C-alpha cells in the first residue's frame, strides 16, 4: 500500500509534486469501511485516488514517474552505456541539466518504508531505503556517488541482514546506472528485509495499465484455469447480454456466448467489442489486487460500467489501491467518493504540471464537486475559445 509518492523534474513535472493516499480523518462517510485501508488507529490509507485535468496537463506523467521508479527496481538497465532512462523537464534549460528526485512511502505488513533516490540520465546520484519496524526509523541501505571517481558506495544499516561478504558483493554489483535493489536481485545473496521490498515492487506495485495493455493482460491470461470462471462472473453481471466466454485445447482463442431472444450466439474473439475486452481486462486486473496505476480509466467503457468496476474493486479487495486518470466527471458524484480521493492537474505559466487535492478547497460536504468543477471553481479544466471559425 502506498502512503505517498513524490517526484521532481521528470517529463512535464518541474517542481516537486506529491500524490497522497493518506486519508483525512476529518472526512467520514458511510462507505469508509470499504474505501479505506486501516493501518493504525491514527492512520488510514485510501484505496482509490482519481486524477482529473485537461488534455496535455500532465495527468499521465505522474503515473509514468511512478512506473519509472518501479522499473528501475524491477527491470534495471542492460548495460553501463545505456543510461538510466531518466527524462527531465525540458521547457527550462536549467532543469535539463539537473537530476530528478523520486520518493515512495509505502507499507508492507503494517510496516512503513521510505524509498527515495536522485538520478540523472547517466547514473544514480543517491539512493536510500529506510523502514520503521518498531515505529522508529532504521536504515536498510544508503548509496552515494563520488563524482570524481564515478564510484558508488553503499552503506548498510544493522537491520539489513547481510554478512560483510554479502555487503561487499552487493556494493560491487551496484554500478552507476542500476538501482541497489535491482543489483540485489542479481547478486545471489539473501536478506529477509530486502526480499520483502523487492517482492513488493515485483508483485504488488503493478505497471501502468493503459487502454491497450488492459486487453493484452486479459488475453495473455485467458488460458489460466481461474480466468474463465472469473471472466464469466464479470460478464454475467455486466448487463452486456453475454453469458460467458470459453476456450478449448483445439481452439485456444476465446469465443463469447451472446444471449439473444433466439438463444445463444457464438462470437469469436476478433469480432468482440473493444469495450467488452477492456472491461474484462480491467475487471480481472482489479480483482488481482495490488497497487494499480490506470491511465484513461473510462476508455471504451460506459460510465456505469466504470462505476461498477470501482465498486467491485472496493468491496472485494483488501490492502489494494488504484490511482487512475480520467475525464469522466460523473465519477465525482459516486456515493463512496470523498474529497481527499479526487486530485486535479493543470499546468502553470512555465508549462509545468501541478497536482492538488479537492480537499484543499475546503468544500462543504453538501456541495457537488462535479458542479464546482464544471463551473471552473476548482481549475484543471480547459477554457475554450469561440467555436465559430471564419477562413
Predicted feature residues:
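Long, charged, glycine-rich C-terminal linkers/tails
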Residues: 85-87, 242-252
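Short beta-strand segments that buttress and anchor functional surface loops
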Residues: 102-107, 129, 256-258
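Switch/communication elements of ASCE P-loop NTPase nucleotide-binding domains
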Residues: 1-73, 255-391
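Broad gene-expression machinery/nucleic-acid interaction feature
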Residues: 2, 16, 99-103, 114, ...
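Glycine-centered tight beta-turn/hairpin loop motif at sheet-sheet or coil-to-beta transitions
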Residues: 12, 108-112, 134, 261-262
Amino acid at each position: 500500500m502506498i502512503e505517498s509518492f513524490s517526484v521532481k523534474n521528470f517529463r512535464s513535472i518541474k517542481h516537486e509534486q506529491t500524490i497522497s493516499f493518506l486519508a483525512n480523518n476529518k472526512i467520514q462517510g458511510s462507505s469508509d469501511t470499504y474505501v479505506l485501508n486501516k493501518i493504525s488507529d491514527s492512520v488510514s490509507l485510501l484505496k482509490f485516488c482519481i486524477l482529473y485535468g485537461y488534455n496535455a496537463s500532465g495527468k499521465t506523467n505522474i503515473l509514468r514517474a511512478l512506473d519509472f521508479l518501479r522499473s528501475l527496481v524491477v527491470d534495471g538497465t542492460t548495460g553501463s552505456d545505456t543510461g538510466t532512462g531518466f527524462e527531465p523537464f525540458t521547457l527550462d534549460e536549467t532543469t535539463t541539466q539537473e537530476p530528478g528526485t523520486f520518493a515512495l512511502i509505502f507499507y508492507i505488513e503494517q510496516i512503513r518504508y521510505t524509498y527515495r533516490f536522485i538520478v540523472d540520465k547517466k547514473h544514480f546520484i543517491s539512493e536510500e531505503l529506510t523502514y520503521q519496524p518498531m515505529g522508529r526509523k532504521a536504515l536498510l541501505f544508503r548509496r552515494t556517488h563520488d563524482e570524481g571517481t564515478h564510484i558508488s558506495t553503499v552503506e548498510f544499516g544493522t537491520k539489513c541482514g547481510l554478512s560483510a561478504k554479502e555487503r561487499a558483493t552487493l556494493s560491487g554489483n551496484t554500478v552507476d546506472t542500476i538501482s541497489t535493489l535491482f543489483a540485489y536481485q542479481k547478486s545471489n545473496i539473501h536478506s529477509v528485509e530486502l526480499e520483502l521490498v523487492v517482492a513488493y515492487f515485483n508483485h504488488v506495485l503493478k505497471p501502468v495499465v493503459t487502454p491497450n495493455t488492459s486487453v493484452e493482460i486479459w488475453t495473455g491470461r485467458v488460458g489460466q484455469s481461474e480466468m474463465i470462471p472469473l471472466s464469466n462472473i464479470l460478464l454475467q453481471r455486466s448487463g452486456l447480454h453475454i453469458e460467458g466466454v470459453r476456450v478449448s485445447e483445439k481452439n485456444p482463442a476465446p469465443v463469447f456466448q451472446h444471449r439473444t431472444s433466439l438463444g445463444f450466439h457464438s462470437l469469436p474473439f476478433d469480432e468482440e467489442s473493444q469495450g467488452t475486452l477492456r472491461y474484462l481486462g480491467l475487471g480481472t486486473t482489479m480483482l488481482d489486487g495490488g497497487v494499480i496505476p490506470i491511465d484513461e480509466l473510462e476508455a471504451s467503457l460506459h460510465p456505469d460500467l466504470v462505476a461498477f468496476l470501482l465498486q467491485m474493486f472496493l468491496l472485494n479487495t483488501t490492502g489494494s489501491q488504484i490511482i487512475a486518470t480520467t475525464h469522466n466527471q460523473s465519477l465525482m458524484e459516486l456515493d463512496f467518493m470523498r474529497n481527499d480521493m479526487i486530485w486535479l492537474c493543470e499546468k502553470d505559466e512555465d508549462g509545468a504540471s501541478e497536482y492538488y487535492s479537492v480537499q484543499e478547497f475546503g468544500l462543504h460536504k453538501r456541495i457537488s464537486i462535479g458542479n464546482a468543477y464544471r463551473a471552473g471553481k476548482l481549475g484543471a479544466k480547459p477554457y475554450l475559445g469561440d467555436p465559430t471559425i471564419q477562413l
